[in-house]
């Protein structure tokens, strides 16, 4: 569960290393974001020659959470970190590579580009 002020790692090669959630999109009083939800983020740490700079505000999709996701068959998948993938204005990934596993729930959310770039889909 990601909320305002949550710090997330970045799971792509857009140049950002660490971001902070500044808004959970989808409703005026929505508090938490789960895997597959879109959030607004501020870049807190970035690599020198990346596509994004420190202080930039971007859209991102949550791909891994410590809280995890519960499936209809009763199984649950949790991760060791909270991670997001940076998106542009058209909700397409900024980076060209995705690092680490992503879940099948992203396939339902129309993020097939992220699913196809990911090295592992759980």
Curated annotation (Swiss-Prot):
GO molecular function, one term: structural constituent of ribosome
A Pfam match: Ribosomal_L14
Key words, A-Z: Ribonucleoprotein, Ribosomal protein, RNA-binding, rRNA-binding
InterPro entries, A to Z: Ribosomal_uL14 (IPR000218), Ribosomal_uL14_bac-type (IPR005745), Ribosomal_uL14_sf (IPR036853)
Record-level GO BP terms: translation
GO cellular component, one term: cytosolic large ribosomal subunit
Superkingdom, taxonomy of origin: Bacteria
Keyword NAD: no
Gene3D superfamilies attached to this UniProt entry: Ribosomal protein L14
SUPFAM superfamilies in UniProt: Ribosomal protein L14
Function: Binds to 23S rRNA. Forms part of two intersubunit bridges in the 70S ribosome.
Family statement: Belongs to the universal ribosomal protein uL14 family.
Oligomer and partners: Part of the 50S ribosomal subunit. Forms a cluster with proteins L3 and L19. In the 70S ribosome, L14 and L19 interact and together make contacts with the 16S rRNA in bridges B5 and B8.
Protein name: Large ribosomal subunit protein uL14
């Amino acid at each position: 569960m990601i909320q305002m002020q949550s710090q997330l790692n970045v799971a792509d090669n857009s140049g950002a290393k660490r971001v902070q959630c500044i808004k959970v999109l989808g409703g005026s009083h929505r508090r938490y974001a789960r895997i597959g939800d879109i959030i607004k983020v501020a870049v807190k740490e970035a690599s020198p020659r990346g596509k994004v700079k420190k202080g930039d505000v971007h859209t991102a999709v949550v791909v891994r959470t410590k809280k995890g996701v519960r499936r209809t068959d009763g199984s649950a998948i949790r991760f060791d970190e909270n991670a997001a993938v940076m998106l542009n204005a058209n909700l397409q990934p900024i980076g060209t590579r995705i690092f680490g596993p992503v879940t099948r729930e992203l396939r339902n959310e129309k993020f097939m580009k992220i699913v196809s770039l990911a090295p592992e889909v759980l």
